[in-house]
């Protein structure tokens, strides 16, 4: 780096110091040495391959939310990324690229930035372990602080950031031209007359620019929310402010919450920004808005953000978050296979992952989609990734669903890798000293990894000292493996056979794969630990024509459902009918963003996102005969009316950021999923050219017969007359996890990541029909 460049960067750093400090205060990091380190920046080696490893200067921008890096080329837009786009930062040689291209001795100098969505990971090497640690710690601090902001604080941060970008010359003043640019930045279109009127109203000094208090006035004018003003005005009965008694009245009357005066006082203490008001136990309008947009005001019941269900029931009594073809990042014909795909699925709470294993060169088993052009990943690397990430998002058991195509020798190596790498986490014996009679519970299996696959003998052989040891034998292929080869229609006697090594067989304890023929046959011949896999079409047929028998079967045994082999694009089927039939392991392609994955994410949103959700009692108790397709009187029938008022949206993202004048025309769709009789949807009209604060005030009414199986999805779309409507954001959750009253609905991207500052404001009421 030349002396001139160093001087330029030093000057820029001094210029940015004030703005950076202001943002540091906003992020809660004022005076933080790690933040200062990121603002100063430093050289890092960017790693793409063995031959492509280049020095780049990285620095945190003064807005404290943008990182840019500079090479010998001129500054380019694509050389920046937002803190909001980062999913996680991993210290060490955690990525496939760093493991492959960087030597072990540089382990502590390495770190990876993992992005949300499809953007490739950024693999970096610092000049020292200390610098690497500072980068990782600094970035994690900012990410954590941004995540901990409530919706209102994120909104304020976002608007201020947009204001800064609109201030082209950086003079901390706003001209009329800059104001128009700012309005487009925040996704709202205003005509020249309205913009001029707004500007003139705030330009009290008549200087032709807005500055200081004038900008503050403009900000307050812009962010004032009519719907909040009306609610606040109705309940703020103490000299125009809201006392603890007023707040208690609001919480009990509108929000239908069972709270005390002490609870109301606690909320004021927590959310009121004005110190004088707080000391007098009063809530200003700003404090009220913060209260509505934080955890307590969210549509998701805060109690459901933790594990709150009984986790001591048998595994078969839970819906289990499950992935299909977990190793794929994209489609099933030519997409890449990666350990990263396993990491992402596990971090999303997935508790059943699939491993499609084939013989590899040099005696090393590989994971990939057979008979296709998908890339390959080493089996042992996948097992290491599972070891490292299995229990970061959830402490409850992980099931490895093996689709084994390997020779005897490589099967033995597979068993060796699982035992040696997973260690004590791998379940190799049944729990207890006697042959069990039912599946263990998630509670009993905390921190354990189970293997699902073929087994040579019955489980009771483990307790039979006189048992004749079987070293190897042939077994029929997994049903899904047979489908890949076109054997699924053959009689059982003609199905493909594979030789199974005892070492691998012995690792299958509670999830022994068996072929399904009929429910009667399963009841007579199969034990509780023997489970079957069903192609989606077969499962759908059973769910439609024999739902009660399927539900009863799933009270004792596990069932796994997988997508049809014809879904080469990794598309997904509707999981709801399978859940309605009590199926636990409903495996979806996690790598494919779609409505079905939204519903899956919504199903497993409550209970602390732990990947296990307890089925309703009428799907666990053999005394009941529930049929979702033909509703009769029973404990499942709790007919209720769901009233939803879609009031407004806030700070919807621009879909085409490359076109400054591109503004969304949003509309909202509310969808109900559940038993066939409960499926419904309604949608608002679209609002032209306003993604900043569109308002609908539209009321809808839904009749729900089986609320315990109902799932609600809020979808926001951009209306388009010439082509298909574009996705903006969505949020899905079980009806039983929804809070009543005025609620904030966060919005997620297609890939399930939170959209900072964006949200819906709705009113929800559930009454007996």
Feature-to-residue mapping (PLM):
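Pleckstrin homology
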Residues: 61-119, 735, 739
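Polybasic, Ser/Thr-rich intrinsically disordered tails and inter-domain linkers
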Residues: 1-50, 70-73, 602, 628-631
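C2-type phospholipid-binding modules
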Residues: 408, 417-420, 597, 607, ...
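Exposed aromatic-hydrophobic patches
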Residues: 694-705, 733
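Calcium-regulated, polybasic anionic-phospholipid
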Residues: 349-354, 358-367, 644-691, 720
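Long, acidic (Asp/Glu-rich), low-complexity accessory segments flanking structured domains
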Residues: 117, 147-162, 170, 178, ...
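Polybasic phosphoinositide-binding surfaces of eukaryotic membrane-targeting domains
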Residues: 28-91, 135, 659-660, 666-668, ...
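Canonical pleckstrin homology
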Residues: 53-56, 92-149
